[in-house]
């Protein structure tokens, strides 16, 4: 790997001899200095000394000026000095000594390569990406090449205003993406023919596992039928999930399924199936329903544009992958899975869901609905452990549907189907046998000649097929297939006719699905939004209108505790849309993805060095998925040791809600551990719990630093205690941003962690996903890491893998270059510095705010970690002001709220990250101090306790510019409460405060159909939609 400017000499010329161009036409290029110590002849050692002297002079003349860490870390030297002075400290080293226990501090620098220049990182990544070979892949199995509209790529996927938003917990500043996600839900509901859909899940396979769990929850039965013609990765993920949920999965063809025992919770089938066959499942659905079993259909949205939807033959749950709606393959992800249900199952549905409610003025608005069923509230009793899903990719798919409309989607579907019909006819003419007569886009072919010969000809054209175990070949076509592609496919199979000649021989008679009883006749996407933005001009304006409604990192800091909303730099994000990363099918042979393999290996090596673990699995594609995978790995390890009875998992009460939800998913029995008044694990209670459950102890789940924002002094003792009693230590990586370069979980006793790459390592949050949650493990757990049924991702000898946890072998592969680039550009020193500044920023803010709010928890020497909790509970009694009032009022100051009422109800948790400079920290602190003064005004009777800027917040532009203003405070106080909040730079909430209760009581989670717009809108029609 090349070094930066200091390792290069400057040379005039045209770049002869392999120099790397600085810029076209400049006549300048870089040439690497010789490392030959011989001096090159008669000059002897003097030549070396002259070269060394020249080098030092050159470094002085051409000092490095593109140190990425200086771009990533907000506070400069002056800011740091001032913050340290405010804390009464002489240096950052002193701060770290007083914050992080000496017993766990890393005594050496991280062993990592020197940082790569920001300008050079893209060149290095280009070299890696070029090792990926972009063949035409007709493998299918839920993954298809597609045409990504450039307007969506540029204005959404590559737009920081869309990708740096957080999950829309604050709807008043999130109406844009909430509307887009409602469009996505409507799209899914319409196309599948079901009543309600959620706002995305992680991938098709995990959506199928969630469907199985829903069936099990619904009727408490413990047998689940799976049609073996589902995609193999889907079957594997369902089997892995079922193993720890006590559900028996049986692979049965429909005619083999016996429901007479009334012990079957549900059945899963694929429509069209993995071989491409379209068949009628009506009879199976009816048989299942007669005995109270639910039916789950894995399906394809594009196929359903011309194929009878599952909702029309009684299916209860439909699921699948929306990837082919304008989202790149990306070697497996990220993609948005869809999940739709009948209305009677909506309150059991996993994942986030957008619904309609009203704001304080009565205006219809959007919000996240039914949150009481989610992990952050219900913990181990939640419908799922899902936290981050795939909002950004769901938004892309929704925009794809909006851009094309129903007619455009039908056109694409018919084109794909017609191409498949032409290919099928040509193959039959060439003497090959098709296994199925009715299909959409996939053919299973019994070759009439040598398969080896066919595959050899395919390799000549750089084309991939699917090879079935029985020696047949699978060919799945997509919307990018051209006439030339068809000609190449026909040539590979020895057909002497061209696609044009085959088509002419077929004529225009309706064939295939369009001439069968399976043809779709019902309308879909009738809502106005899918019929208004078919020109690029209109779509760009619509996307911009939505973007402008949402606060993101382009506006101001997002101080959400435990969320690490740091910079997502352009250099890190740029490579994810390169075709060498974007256009690779996840199941291509490994020799076609050598660039990806090199990147995985390098990232794994760096993450192991950073964490102290020995191996990393990249398969989990979210933090919650990583928790489940890590705990399941522990279960597999204990099972192999003959300790299957160990199922108790200890979890502190301060833990994130995903912890107990994930432990429950892994089949563990949760035992809560108390937290003392200082925010630490109550060691006495922990010891009592360990002693009580020592025979059955499987693990403890801890977060470090704790969710209360402190480095607990006795973390090593806690880990040792668990190990002494036969348990394993799972350390939640949510707060890894306070550890990198300073301490390593693998050194102080942790056995496994998930790493939130979308927090610590700069993958953007995307408004609610994507995320990545790879797990790092110590050596003894490495043989149990996840495997995959299609692609071998680890040696099989001496391993007992836990199973498969995600659809793709390496999860959401295409966003891993972001974290790789961040680590390479920062280097070991820069990564440690980022951690130090994150801790400095948090302590500076805590210091500024401590005179106005109580800082709830501090470490042993009075300092916080990278985040801290402000106690707003006393204001409920003194002024009838709650945390939610402070959160909404912050919107008027231009800020997203901190994490609200977690981990302690009635509080606010603040995490500034290292990317924010002192000026931004001060603006936020000024806002909080100003709000405290507004609370004091209520306490002291200077303003009305019911009608005041806090209770009436946020103040939208419509509100402030209304001709009627009857509030006992001025418009200026409402909208411009401090000098830095100015008309020219203010972010405006677009609605008044929402009514959560009304939204859950009047659940509407799709857009109404076009008929609504034929007459004045009515509540009755909206409810019936």
Swiss-Prot record:
Modified residues (N6-(pyridoxal phosphate)lysine): 759
Region feature (Disordered): 16-51
Cofactor(s) recorded in Swiss-Prot or TrEMBL: pyridoxal 5'-phosphate
Keyword annotations: Acetylation, Mitochondrion, Oxidoreductase, Pyridoxal phosphate, Transit peptide
Transit peptide: 1-35
GO molecular function: enzyme binding; glycine binding; glycine dehydrogenase (decarboxylating) activity; lyase activity; protein homodimerization activity; pyridoxal binding; pyridoxal phosphate binding
SUPFAM superfamilies, per the entry: PLP-dependent transferases
Intrachain disulfide bonds: none
CDD domains in the record: GDC-P (cd00613)
Protein localization: Mitochondrion
Gene3D superfamilies linked: Aspartate Aminotransferase, domain 1, Type I PLP-dependent aspartate aminotransferase-like (Major domain)
Single GO biological process annotation from the record: glycine decarboxylation via glycine cleavage system
EC number: 1.4.4.2
Entry GO terms, CC: glycine cleavage complex; mitochondrion; nucleoplasm; plasma membrane
Regulation (activators, inhibitors): Stimulated by lipoic acid. Inhibited in presence of methylamine.
Transmembrane parts of this sequence: none
Primary subcellular site in the record, as a coarse category: mitochondrion
Record's keyword annotation contains Chloroplast: no
Family, per entry: Belongs to the GcvP family.
Record's subunit section: Interacts with GCSH. Homodimer. The glycine cleavage system is composed of four proteins: P (GLDC), T (GCST), L (DLD) and H (GCSH).
Full protein name: Glycine dehydrogenase (decarboxylating), mitochondrial
Organism (species): Mus musculus
